[in-house]
């Protein structure tokens, strides 16, 4: 069993915002693999699907980005999962818009949702799939930028990034993090 966590903020006002790209990928993954309708559990919405005969739980914490760790910890404890069974999908300001990068482990890189997950799990040893949203224009506050909606051009780039992220996630489930990194990090570029 694997746990895929899409990070974002709950509520319609955050739909299609840069910070919610993790939710967008999670939703696309559940649609692609005909997952179960989401149920409310672990302070999040969780669906179940099968990828390459592996049971995959797809969790979207409803605690807001900065408190995502408590939801992830509850799901991990309930299903008795190890950090190697988890993939967290989130936005990254330090990657160009639409670029996808999978990592085996590492620091939060300033991403507040990842910071909270590291705090709750007591470890950085879990995979993360980061999707570039680029840097804010001059004079923009970072918070306004990440909570802002994608413009039309960005949304087109994100549609490709979402497909690429779903492919990379399926490879991670079926073939492991090393194979997924080798196959999808090189192919990502915009």
From Swiss-Prot:
Its main location: cytoplasm. It comes from the Bacteria. It is found in: Cytoplasm. PANTHER family: PEPTIDYL-TRNA HYDROLASE (PTHR17224:SF1). GO terms for biological process: protein quality control for misfolded or incompletely synthesized proteins; rescue of stalled ribosome. It catalyses: an N-acyl-L-alpha-aminoacyl-tRNA + H2O = an N-acyl-L-amino acid + a tRNA + H(+). This is Peptidyl-tRNA hydrolase. Gene3D superfamilies: Peptidyl-tRNA hydrolase (3.40.50.1470). Belongs to the PTH family. The record marks 9 as: Discriminates between blocked and unblocked aminoacyl-tRNA. GO terms for molecular function: peptidyl-tRNA hydrolase activity; tRNA binding. Its EC number is 3.1.1.29. TRNA binds at residues 14, 64, 66. NCBIfam families: pth (TIGR00447). Monomer. The active site is at 19 (proton acceptor). InterPro entries: Pept_tRNA_hydro, Pept_tRNA_hydro_CS, Pept_tRNA_hydro_sf. It holds the Pfam family Pept_tRNA_hydro. It is an enzyme of class 3 (hydrolase). Hydrolyzes ribosome-free peptidyl-tRNAs (with 1 or more amino acids incorporated), which drop off the ribosome during protein synthesis, or as a result of ribosome stalling. The record marks 91 as: Stabilizes the basic form of H active site to accept a proton. GO terms for cellular component: cytoplasm. Keywords: Cytoplasm, Hydrolase, RNA-binding, tRNA-binding. The keyword Phosphoprotein does not apply.
């Amino acid at each position: 069993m694997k746990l895929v966590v899409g990070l974002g903020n709950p509520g319609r006002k955050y739909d299609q915002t840069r910070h919610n790209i993790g939710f967008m990928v999670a939703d696309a993954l559940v649609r692609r693999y005909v997952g179960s309708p989401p149920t409310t559990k672990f302070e999040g919405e969780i669906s179940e699907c099968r990828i390459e005969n592996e049971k995959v739980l797809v969790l979207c914490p409803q605690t807001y980005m900065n408190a995502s760790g408590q939801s992830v910890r509850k799901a991990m404890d309930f299903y008795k999962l190890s950090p190697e069974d988890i993939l967290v999908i989130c936005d990254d300001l330090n990657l160009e818009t639409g670029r996808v990068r999978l990592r085996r482990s590492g620091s939060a890189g300033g991403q507040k949702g990842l910071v909270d997950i590291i705090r709750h799990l007591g470890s950085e040893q879990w995979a993360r799939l980061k999707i570039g949203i680029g840097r804010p224009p001059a004079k923009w506050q970072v918070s306004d930028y990440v909570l802002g909606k994608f413009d039309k051009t960005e949304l087109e780039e994100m549609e490709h990034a979402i497909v690429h992220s779903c492919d990379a996630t399926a490879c991670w489930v079926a073939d492991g993090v090393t194979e997924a990194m080798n196959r999808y990090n090189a192919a990502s570029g915009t």
